[in-house]
Amino acid sequence: MSEIEEKFNESSYGADSIKVLKGLEAVRKRPGMYIGDVGDGSGLHHMIYEVVDNAIDESLAGYCDLVRVTLNKNGSVTVSDNGRGIPVEIHGEEGISAAEVIMTQLHAGGKFDQNAYKVAGGLHGVGVSVVNALSEWLELRIWRNNKEYLMRFNNGITEAPLAVVKENIDKKGTEVTFFPSVETFTNIEFDFGTIEHRLRELAFLNSGVKILLVDNRFEEVKEVEFYYTGGIEAYVKYIDRAKHAIHPCIVVNTENAESGISLELAMHWNDSYHENILCFTNNIRQRDGGTHLSAFKSAITRVITSYLDTTGLNKKAKNYFSGEDTREGLCCVLSVKVPDPKFSSQTKDKLVSSEVRPVVENAVYTKVLEWFEEHPAEAKAIIAKIMEAANAREAARKARELTRRKSALEVSNLPGKLADCHAKDPAISELFIVEGDSAGGTAKQGRDSKIQAILPLRGKILNVERARFDKMLGSDQIGTLITALGISVEREFSLEKLRYHKVIIMTDADVDGSHIRTLLLTFFYRHMPELINKGYLYIAQPPLYKVKKGAAEFYLKNEQALQDYLIKSTINDATLILDDKERLVGDNLEELINKVVKFNGLLDHASKKFNRSITEILAINDLLNNKIFEPESDLRLKKALDVLNSLEDSPDKTNWEVLKHENKIEFFRFSRGLKESKILLKEQLESFEFVQISKFALTIFDIFSKQLKLIVKSQEFDILTPSQLLNTIIECGKRGINIQRFKGLGEMNSDQLWETTLDPTKRTLLQVRVAEIDEAEGIFSTLMGDVVEPRRLFIQANALNVVNLDV
């Protein structure tokens, strides 16, 4: 019997454990008060988190070690666990099953009974009833008492009482499947990445609990497992995986018997210049901190002060250090478990429980100071970093004072390169940051000078990820940008003086432009995060192509838009004839072309691993599977190769031939005496990419097994493969038009730039948002930091996803 089964005690968690505080109608009337924003996706995802938090609460109580979240094809979500199962007995006060009480009445649940749960999360403490109230339908399955129970709800209303559907079941747990209400939520499509981040967070915070996330919505099934035995120490290492830690992790794990408050903490200093502290209460993240964060900061400052006084190292300090100096480069995960936590709002973004502060401050001070005393060499390295931070802060202060004195003597302290706008209202003013004087000149001519300002940046932009604050202030480009914006950075940061409420990065669509954009994004993320949080930072989307047909001119954003245009311009004049009989035109032909486009995308992706032409010809002949090894398929394989050879006819190359082996097939030919060989392994045929291609090919198999002839404006083409059909359609679309590809903004004249990128009524802007702070932290550190290995691994992992590489 497992430890979890041994702990199982139904008598301690029964119907009488459920305390009731009634009322659900308010949830449907004002859902935002209970579940979060119903328009931006946060409330939608909180529906999942609420159910998952119930399962995690079971694990905190010691009864659950497996949680599974499944995104279903029909748009619903299933959350299951192997906990005790929701109580099913008739509730004494309500006269209905405890399960129905929990699902239909607000503020009902075991969390209100201290004997059932000592500590609990639960998104807003309102129970899964909120999820039920805001779901079009919900299905509840419970495994308890060796039985399986089932109950269904529509818009929070019970369809029928809880019923036993199976008996003699050796299983315990709860499963909730729900479909969000389209009347409540603006968008009901769940984002895999958002859910993945939260579940990974929970797995780190609850060491030993396995959490599975499965996405069944698409042909490509995604499955991710989160299981960490290292707890929050492993979490700190994960967050800081792209940085150099200057010492091993400091771990604190303690509980205050009197208050029942427990503390878990893992922290280390790294060689970066930014602090990163994540705070949790009962597994819920407090993005705005609170009493636990204040206590931690105070304790760390006290530790450093005390250690300096004790060791005499303070005599070597050139400058007094501040609390911020002690936290430069500090990465910490702080998790407290509190029996009855209090928060500043229902979204629980800030902890206000005053009793938490002394517990955390005393524990952190005692344990961390003890660690310093036991590890003098590591402590010395930490102190050296803090002193260096204090010196840099002092140098930055002097640099700011010098800048202010210079500004006070100038008639106008706006940079000379800035072509400012006439408007003084920041709400309607826009600043375009462009690379180089050439693009800057064109932008100045094409802009609306009433509301649009242009700031050209010339020369190399500093990578602030690798630079101290004082060095950053000395950078000409960064200094120019700060002055133009009208605000300072770091400790003096205030959006009140921001001169533009749209700050738009406008760079070329090549590698250099991408690099400059990344450097600017790094600066804003590190030193002006509020600009991003308020939604003031944007990225311009200049077009990649200009298309001219007769007197008409228009612009296309990217390769995909160009392809779509060329297909649509041809499709109305095209007819596909099948076996000299059936004809595909109009919508039917367009439907086929859309399938071919998707098929081509699958082939492009798989071409990184095997020859594209061979893959395609095998797929449309139903041979991209184990059938290819069967003798009965030899004739079909020969015909397929004949088609391939007719398409790739070249005087320098011989025809493709094939050799079958037990577990592989070799395709080979000779080019000027040299053998070119492609090996297809049997195991490759079972890979996800090939299975996906093979299945999709069956949807167009009937058409491409026939003799095809494409007619476009009386011109005829014999068609043998999907790629040939698509390429012919595209080439026909190019006739009579002129296509110009822009490599840089400087290639556009001022009218073109206005029409495509500057005109507020026509342009496309991407608003910069940070969905998950610690994920963004990891990405910036990986791509822009000093550590090479994580960057190399990142590039290796994503190299095959590159579609267009500008070299």
From Swiss-Prot:
CC terms in the record's Gene Ontology section: chromosome; cytoplasm
GO MF assignments: ATP binding; DNA binding; DNA topoisomerase type II (double strand cut, ATP-hydrolyzing) activity; metal ion binding
Subcellular location: Cytoplasm
Cofactor list: Mg(2+); Mn(2+); Ca(2+)
GO-annotated biological processes: DNA topological change; DNA-templated DNA replication
Alphabetized Pfam families for the sequence: DNA_gyraseB, DNA_gyraseB_C, GyrB_hook, HATPase_c, Toprim
Cofactor binding summary note: Binds two Mg(2+) per subunit. The magnesium ions form salt bridges with both the protein and the DNA. Can also accept other divalent metal cations, such as Mn(2+) or Ca(2+).
EC numbers on record: 5.6.2.2
Record-annotated Toprim domain positions: 429-543
UniProt KW keywords: ATP-binding, Cytoplasm, DNA-binding, Isomerase, Magnesium, Metal-binding, Nucleotide-binding, Topoisomerase
Main location as per UniProt: cytoplasm
Residues at which Mg(2+) 2 binds: 508, 510
Protein known as: DNA gyrase subunit B
Species of origin: Rickettsia conorii (strain ATCC VR-613 / Malish 7)
